[in-house]
Amino acid sequence: MEHKDDDDDDVSFAKWMSSFWGHSWREEDQRGLRERHRPQATSHRKTSLPCPLPVLPRIPSSDRHPRRHSHEDQEFRCRSSDRLPRRHSHEDQKFRCRSHVRDYGEYSEDGSFKEPLESKGRSHSKIEKFSESFERQLCFRTKRSASLGPESRKERNERECLRMEIKSRKKVEEERSSRKEEHGEAHMAPLFEKGPE
């Protein structure tokens, strides 16, 4: 008995939904549209997209990295695909397929994944850029305060302390980077001396 009530509820809900979306539930049922709502093949879904997708080689799931796609990227892809199809070389496909990996690493010719060399120095360059921008702001503030009137002794002392702090941070960073380079070279030297065994 309860089973029949559940079916009635489902039917009434389906009728309400179909009336809400502006089509008749009975007409759909008569035309057999319910049987047609099976999962579609990927080829059918691809043909129904507004712009064709380029054929790219599959990347193993272990090599995939998340990438955010902006609205401009989608517009660019749609506009570029509107042009006449052109033949892509193997290198073009590699580039298109793996361009999102450029921040994470690169592939060698044999297909193995390598960490980028620049990532090690990237943090150092960010620190340098930050300290330079900080110095520029500091200079701008001192010029502005000088134009407003004579500096107080307190302001001058603060400015000198900031300059000394910046210089000491730069020295520490340079020492760290030189130690890392020396340390890296020290580890690499014995490897080259041994040679193949």
Curated annotation (Swiss-Prot):
Gene name of this polypeptide: LNP1
The protein's name: Leukemia NUP98 fusion partner 1 homolog
Q: What InterPro entries does this protein's entry cite?
A: LNP1 (IPR029280)
Q: Which domain of life is it from?
A: Eukaryota
Q: What ranges does the record list as Basic residues composition bias?
A: 34-47
Q: Please note every region of biased composition (Basic and acidic residues).
A: 70-128, 167-186
Region entry Disordered, spans: 28-128, 167-197
The record, for Pfam families, names: LNP1
